[in-house]
Amino acid sequence: EFPASQKSNDAGEVTSWFVSKWGPFLSNKMMRNILGQTKSGFNIREIMDNKKILLINLSKGKTGELNAKLLGMIFVMKFQAAAMSRADTAEDDRQDFCLFVDEFQNFSTESFESILSEARKYRLNLVLANQFMTQLTDKIREAILGNVGTIMSGRLGVTDAELMEKAFAPVFNAEDLHAMPNYSAIATVMMFDMPTSPFTMKLLPPMGESSNELMERMKVYASSKYGRPREDVEREIEARLADTSSKPAAPAMAT
């Protein structure tokens, strides 16, 4: 939204403000190709309803910190909107869908608060992972502890152990959380709409071996089914930009 303090009848000033905010994203070829397409190659609602798997790599090393944050926020809001659109489906017919968000503090917005408090009835389940509670704002932290049914914690640092102690008290204290051995955790889960007493659990160490060959084959298959040739995308975007730049500028509004 154009800031009230900068409102102007001059269309040129509005355009300049917009370009200054979006310029860093649109000047990045990868981001321009992602955001500049007129139609997405996949439908979030269809993915949720048909129990498909969508993997989104938002590595800062590949996309850049600012770009990763923007894309992460966009996807979170799209999943929220898709979940809310399930209002047109009978509650018993809604399929459970799990949204796993690693390092979610990078994408935490008010959408998370809304999802935590409202999206449960639309069968959107969140699995949120991060390293330190201090990475979260007080508002997000309170929303999590107040709405999440299952909380699982491995070994924590001193500060986080003190923050999380109340979730597992009086069975476990901060010292227990700080002294957890490897591949162990303390958890409390929701059963029959009631939280269980906190308990300890053993976690499985990494199992099996990854297959780079299989991974590459899956990437090729997914790209061929849902993607488009980069050259076609860039050609369409450049054509639209050229068409826009050739049009005369809108006259300034009279004051």
Predicted regions and their residues:
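P-loop NTPase motor domains
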Residues: 1-124, 140, 177-181, 187-195, ...
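Conserved P-loop NTPase motor module
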Residues: 10-13, 17, 53, 70, ...
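Conserved NTP-handling cores and scaffolds of large molecular machines
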Residues: 22-29, 78-87, 123, 140, ...
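Short, solvent-exposed coil/turn linker segments
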Residues: 43, 57-59, 132, 173, ...
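Active-site donor-binding loop signature of nucleotide-sugar glycosyltransferases
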Residues: 58, 156, 203
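Conserved ATP-driven motor cores of ASCE-family P-loop NTPases powering translocation/secretion/packaging/pilus
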Residues: 115-197
